[in-house]
Amino acid sequence: MQITKTAVAGTLESSDVQIRIAPSTTMDIEINSSVAKQFGEDILNSVTAVLAQFEVSSAQIIIEDKGALDCVLRARLKAALLRATDEALAWEKIL
């Protein structure tokens, strides 16, 4: 998947996560989390798994986590990715 435009998903409310995605020539992931010491590695693993599923090889991704559950993180990232591309989607890979 090619990231072609800037997109945002989520909020900065407690137990949520805001994800901002923009086009880039490299993969740049920034994680700002209130629970980074406990779950920072798990957050990064979830993000890289979703990016692999969507076949994203380059993007600037900024994650502002306020203690979101893993399912919320993945859903917000998928929403942001879908908003950031103009490509036709292979839904069988996503679901």
UniProtKB/Swiss-Prot annotation:
Cellular component GO terms held in the UniProt record: cytoplasm
Modified residues (O-(phosphoribosyl dephospho-coenzyme A)serine): S14
Keyword Protein transport: no
Pfam hit, one: ACP
Subcellular location, record wording: Cytoplasm
Domain of life assignment: Bacteria
Record bears the keyword Metal-binding: no
Sorted UniProt keywords: Cytoplasm, Phosphoprotein
Function description: Covalent carrier of the coenzyme of citrate lyase.
Assembly, per entry: Oligomer with a subunit composition of (alpha,beta,gamma)6.
Family affiliation: Belongs to the CitD family.
UniProt xrefs under NCBIfam families: citD, PRK13253.1
HAMAP family linked: CitD (MF_00805)
Protein name: Citrate lyase acyl carrier protein
Annotated organism of origin: Haemophilus ducreyi (strain 35000HP / ATCC 700724)
